[in-house]
From Swiss-Prot:
EC number: 2.7.14.1
NCBIfam families: PRK01059.1-4, PRK01059.1-5
GO BP terms: phosphocreatine biosynthetic process
Domain Phosphagen kinase C-terminal: 24-255
Catalysed transformations (reactions): L-arginyl-[protein] + ATP = N(omega)-phospho-L-arginyl-[protein] + ADP + H(+)
Keywords from the UniProt entry: Allosteric enzyme, ATP-binding, Kinase, Nucleotide-binding, Transferase
Its biological purpose: Catalyzes the specific phosphorylation of arginine residues in a large number of proteins. Is part of the bacterial stress response system. Protein arginine phosphorylation has a physiologically important role and is involved in the regulation of many critical cellular processes, such as protein homeostasis, motility, competence, and stringent and stress responses, by regulating gene expression and protein activity.
Alphabetical list of PROSITE patterns matching this protein: PHOSPHAGEN_KINASE, PHOSPHAGEN_KINASE_C
Name by which UniProt lists this protein: Protein-arginine kinase
Gene name of the encoded protein: mcsB
Length: 358
């Protein structure tokens, strides 16, 4: 196994599985932040200290891997090209911080890409568990298994009063971030998001774009996560998030039913216009592509568009990002060239899907 194995396909093996409410919740994630008591935390460490952390973790974990993680591969950021790191970010396998700002950053990736351990990110160790659909409980179970395995080899920085100690005070306590990636096109079309999203923030949750903090919400895709980690158990955090997400799922389904009942013709027109643009465009920028893909995904979920799998929309969301476009072009592309390549890739992928269905 090598880096090429993780860059070969836009869709990770875990994304191909079916999860609960997958027509609305694209994925679930649990992330655990941990530090080692014997080393300076990454935000204050020197390059020499960061190197010592990387070596210590690699020596402790690299040759064992255990049942929790399965067959895995250790990848060093310094050995990777900039575009390779960008592609791993686009697949949500590593964070932008690890790719761009880490000192001697590394990642240990499981074979199916559902589990990863980032080293020398904002914290010494960040464990991530991913699952298709609304599967926070399964993600938590998998993340905890990896956490137990890591802790059996390393000594964590832990305080009996405050819990796990982290670089950012907002992560102190459980050190856990639970999140879902959710598609809310009907709530956006019916202009209910302007009311709903501020209410979610008031409940102690955070709404972001699909690449986390600082990213823009595109294509009616939102990442919703907990904000508070201190004073709550991991199960409390998951339960709180699940309660809000279940309400969002119900509201999105009601909004979809309302559109079908009162605006079916207009909705169909919007869906097929977007499909037509994607299938026939020769230039399309990232924002428009994401917006049109959102419309088409809704059309597939509502049964308007047949013989097209919803998973190819998830695939195209990743394939049309700059890193993957440049990988397939085998060269650095200008923004204008990316728009041309993006349109060509979408045209070809939709044509292939149609021919396969026939």
């Amino acid at each position: 196994m090598s880096l090429d194995r993780f860059l070969k396909n836009a869709i990770s093996p875990w994304m191909k599985k079916d999860g609960s409410d997958a027509d609305i919740v694209l994925s679930s994630r649990i992330r655990l932040a941990r530090n080692m008591s014997a080393f300076t935390f990454p935000m204050l460490s020197s390059k020499e200290e960061a190197y010592a952390v990387a070596k210590h973790v690699k020596d402790a974990l690299g040759g064992t891997q255990g049942e929790a993680l399965g067959k895995a591969e250790m990848l060093a950021m310094e050995d990777m090209r900039t575009n390779d790191k960008r592609m791993l970010v686009e697949k949500h396998l590593i964070s932008p911080h690890l790719a761009e700002q880490s000192k001697y950053g590394m990642v240990l990736l499981s074979g199916d890409e559902s589990l990863s351990i980032m080293i020398n990110e904002e914290d010494h160790i960040r464990i991530q568990s991913l699952s298709a659909g609304f599967e926070l409980e399964n993600c938590l179970q998998a993340a905890n298994a990896v956490d137990d395995w890591v802790e059996s080899h390393l000594t964590y920085a832990y305080d009996s009063q405050y819990g796990y100690l982290t670089s950012c005070p907002t992560n102190v306590g459980t050190g856990m971030r639970a999140s879902v990636m959710i598609h809310l096109p009907a709530l956006a079309m019916t202009r209910q998001l302007q009311r709903i999203l501020p209410a979610i923030n008031q409940l102690g949750l955070v709404v972001r774009g699909i690449y986390g903090e600082g990213s823009e919400a595109l294509g009616n895709l939102f990442q919703i996560s907990n904000q508070i980690t201190l004073g709550k158990t991991e199960q409390d955090i998951v339960d709180d998030l699940q309660g809000v997400v279940k309400q969002l799922i119900r509201q999105e389904r009601v909004a979809r039913d309302s559109l079908l009942q009162h605006s079916k013709l207009e909705l169909k027109d919007r869906v097929f216009r977007s499909y037509g643009i994607l299938a026939n465009s020769y230039i399309i920028d990232s924002k428009e592509a994401t917006r049109r893909l959102s419309d088409v995904r809704l059309g597939i979920d509502l049964g308007f568009i047949e013989n097209t799998a919803g998973k190819i929309l998830d695939e195209l969301m990743i394939l049309t990002q700059p890193g993957f476009l440049q990988q397939y072009a085998k060269t650095v592309l200008t923004p204008e060239q990316r728009d041309e390549r993006r349109a060509a890739l979408i045209r070809e992928r939709l044509k292939l899907e149609h021919e396969t269905a026939d």
